Amino acid sequence: LLALENTMQGKVLPTEYLAAASRLTREHGLALHLDGARLYNAAVKLGVDAGDITRHFDSVSVCLSKGLGAPVGSVLCGTADLITRARRLRKMVGGGMRQAGQLAAAGLYALDHQVARLADDHANAQLLADGLRAAGYDVEPVQTNMVYAQVGDRAEALKAFAAEQGIRLSAA
């Protein structure tokens, strides 16, 4: 199994790369899985339908809360056999929820209404990155909704300024 993440730290894997990965796994008899927690961010950035990305994969997981606003939940997509095996394994390890209809409804709403808003998230991330650059911070190029900046010894000052604006910052 080869598992790829798209986006990866906010960076989009090009469709040509995905096609090459698909060819490679086929040549070696491997399955190809997409961790699509931010699949729709990648699709919006590339200007393509999510299916243009997922067609290269044997299985895909999609998070409904990251960026789409559902309270919880993910979807696993694959063959009927894969889904049957996944359900069995989920039960074996104690997974599953009873009466999850309300959460499923929130997930469906997110898919129907929130994907179109991801371009706004991307634009806001770019606006933040531009502001940080203008203030003299070293910021990586932004493709989607994630901003990575090196703030050095000015971290506390930036955190305090952001807090005054009602923004919480996290750092690694």
Describe these PLM feature segments:
Residues 1-165, 169-171:
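Conserved PLP-enzyme active-site core in the AAT-like
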